[in-house]
């Protein structure tokens, strides 16, 4: 009888973190087992039917650049695509897509089932096998033991999950799925630092009962239609659908206020803290009491269903209040609710107990990714899952870990924030969290990370060939623009005014002309000489290459300045702190700082500097102590390094 029970990596959970973790590990050649309580829910979008957004779209592009599945699955399932902040600078532009839930799950499952080195098995996990301080496997509900050299735990909201609808509550991982109570209890036995968080979801509405004629239509972008993945294309997209906009009103707000005495949030039944940037409708009405109306987006759940997701009214109010508040809004007077909204509480574990690899500090080989680390959102989960899967594989291969820095990726910002600052509420990514966001754009995610992904072994041949072609095309076009000159002798003043806004008084390289505020790559390519010959073009046709060339030239000064800033910080950012470092012995440190550093054990000086309460003066004292102590990397530092810190 042949049934494999020994693997290199076990991934527990088949959500966005688990699927990316399993795919990454398997792409890198490790035998990988993905355990899920239900194979039918692999890649399920548990809340809103959308991928991307401000900060989140950047993470999706980074996962894609490393060979991940989320972006290409969205291209195959996306029923509306938009570029947010399109009128603003490239650093904050972000792709957002509405996705057909069924098509998205199909796209993810297809990749899982066709990925070499990856096995799927349907069983919930009740226990982890731990020998000494190392995890060695997992035990399912049926008592089946699987052994592995690394385990990635991506439990989502399932750990001791509890759903609240009004004053009623029951145990669940999400609506329709059982919780992971035994696994939660087992993790508590392992003395991992733990807390409770909560999130919520709105009621779903039957589209046949919605009067769209009185709502505002919100179509997707059409010129051009955005594409998420470097491997994607518009031809992959299914039929496109609009969203619709309505608003709450004073009657809605009165109904909500009248139901607060039966709200689990406002009666103390819910202990967990909810997401600040995705508040429930009752929280909005309470916190923004002076606001007369809130915008609500009706988002289609898919092409083959009438179900709509009313984005903006997440709630745990009793069902009768939910029905009344929905029907109080314009266009929803006769709305039929298909599923009630609810809040869910769940266990999470303090991410300050993790290394930058997402491996736990106390149990070797055990990695955490997704909501278990206190984050919220599909995109944040997928990025963490990929990182955990990569590092689990690297550990087994006895290779150096990969931990992106804050100046390299939004994923680096995400993980650094989690492991140095922890969370008091579900963490959501925004572009404002990244101090080097001009260098961490959506458009250059592949230029930043695909080379790294190839070296790690998680970027395939087809994607690599596409990337090399693009990189070479960008380099060639930049060189052409820098070496092609235009002078007043061959450029008529009228033509210069048409393209450049004014005439030129001397010879200019095309690259310098493109840097002018009102000149675009497209208009520059149309520049003609006095004899009618092309002076600017024909240029390149590939939109991604044109975009990269234009941004690199127009923002060169700012990007170079940011690169110099990164270089200044590099002298201490990546200095590894000794594992045995005794913070209590550092003279001049406050007791609070000593205790925090001793508890969190930061891996680098840069991480230490971002722990709450650790001041620049404290970092300087640590540097002095380390240099005097003769610690290898610090003894060779130049004089006055501590002053620069």
UniProtKB/Swiss-Prot annotation:
FAD binds at residues 13-18. NAD(+) binds at residues 274-288. InterPro entries: FAD/NAD-bd_sf, GIDA_C_N, MnmG, MnmG-rel, MnmG-rel_CS, MnmG_C, MnmG_C_subdom, MnmG_C_subdom_sf. It is found in: Cytoplasm. The keyword Flavoprotein applies. Belongs to the MnmG family. HAMAP family: MnmG_GidA. This is tRNA uridine 5-carboxymethylaminomethyl modification enzyme MnmG. It comes from Herminiimonas arsenicoxydans.
């Amino acid at each position: 009888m042949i049934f494999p029970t020994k693997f290199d990596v076990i991934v527990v959970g088949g959500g966005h973190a688990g699927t990316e973790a399993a795919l990454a590990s398997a792409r890198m050649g490790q035998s990988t087992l993905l355990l899920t309580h239900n194979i039918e829910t692999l890649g399920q979008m548990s809340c809103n039917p959308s991928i991307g957004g401000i900060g989140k779209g950047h993470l999706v592009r980074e996962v894609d650049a490393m060979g991940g599945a989320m972006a290409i699955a969205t291209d195959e399932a996306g029923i509306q695509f938009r570029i947010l902040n399109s009128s603003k600078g490239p650093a904050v532009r972000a792709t957002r897509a509405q996705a057909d839930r069924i098509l998205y799950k199909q796209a993810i499952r297809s990749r899982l089932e066709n990925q070499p080195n990856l096995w799927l098995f349907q069983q919930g996990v009740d226990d982890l096998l731990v020998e000494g301080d190392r995890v060695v496997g997992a035990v399912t509900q049926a008592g089946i033991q699987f052994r592995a050299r690394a385990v990635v735990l991506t439990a989502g909201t399932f750990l001791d999950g509890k759903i609240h609808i009004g004053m009623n509550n029951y145990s669940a991982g999400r609506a329709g799925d059982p919780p992971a109570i035994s696994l939660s209890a087992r993790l508590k036995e392992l003395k991992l630092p733990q807390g409770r968080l909560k999130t919520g979801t709105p009621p779903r509405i039957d589209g046949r009962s919605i009067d769209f004629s009185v709502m505002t239509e919100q179509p997707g972008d059409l010129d051009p239609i955005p594409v998420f993945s470097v491997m994607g294309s518009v031809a992959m997209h299914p039929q496109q659908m609009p969203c619709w906009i309505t608003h709450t009103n004073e009657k809605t707000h009165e109904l909500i206020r009248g139901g607060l005495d039966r709200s689990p949030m406002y009666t103390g039944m819910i202990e967990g803290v909810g997401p600040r940037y995705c508040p429930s409708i009752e929280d909005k009405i309470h916190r923004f009491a002076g606001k007369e109306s809130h915008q609500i987006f009706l988002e289609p759940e898919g092409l083959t269903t009438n179900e709509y997701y009313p984005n903006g009214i997440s709630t745990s109010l009793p069902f009768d209040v939910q029905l009344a508040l929905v029907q109080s809004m314009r266009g929803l007077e006769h709305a039929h609710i298909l599923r009630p909204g609810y809040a869910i509480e769940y266990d999470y574990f303090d991410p300050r107990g993790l290394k930058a690899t997402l491996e736990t500090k106390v149990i070797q080989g055990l990695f955490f990714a997704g909501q278990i680390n206190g984050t919220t959102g599909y995109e944040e989960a997928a990025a963490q899952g990929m990182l955990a899967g990569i590092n689990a594989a690297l550990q087994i291969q006895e290779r150096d870990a990969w931990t992106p820095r804050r100046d390299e990726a939004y994923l680096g910002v995400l993980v650094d924030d989690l492991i140095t600052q922890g969370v008091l509420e579900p963490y959501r990514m925004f572009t404002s969290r990244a101090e080097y966001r001009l260098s961490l754009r959506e458009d250059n995610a592949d230029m930043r990370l695909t080379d790294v992904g190839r070296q790690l072994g998680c970027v395939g041949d087809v994607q690599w060939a596409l990337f090399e072609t693009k990189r070479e095309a960008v380099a060639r076009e930049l060189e052409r623009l820098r070496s092609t000159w235009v002078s007043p002798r061959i450029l008529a003043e009228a033509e210069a005014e048409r393209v450049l806004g004014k005439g030129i008084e001397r010879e200019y390289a095309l690259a310098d002309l493109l840097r002018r505020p009102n000149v675009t790559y497209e208009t520059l390519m149309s520049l003609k000489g006095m004899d009618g010959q092309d002076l600017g073009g024909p240029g390149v046709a590939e939109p991604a290459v044109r975009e990269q060339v234009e941004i690199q030239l127009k923002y060169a000064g700012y990007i170079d300045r940011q690169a110099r800033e990164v270089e200044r910080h590099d002298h201490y950012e990546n200095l590894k702190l000794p594992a045995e470092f005794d913070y209590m012995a550092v003279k001049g440190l406050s007791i609070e700082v000593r205790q925090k550093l001793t508890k969190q054990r930061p891996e680098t000086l840069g991480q230490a500097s971002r722990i709450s309460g650790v001041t620049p003066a404290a970092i300087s004292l640590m540097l002095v102590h380390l240099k005097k102590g003769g610690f290898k990397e610090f003894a060779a530092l130049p004089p006055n390094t501590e002053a620069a810190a």
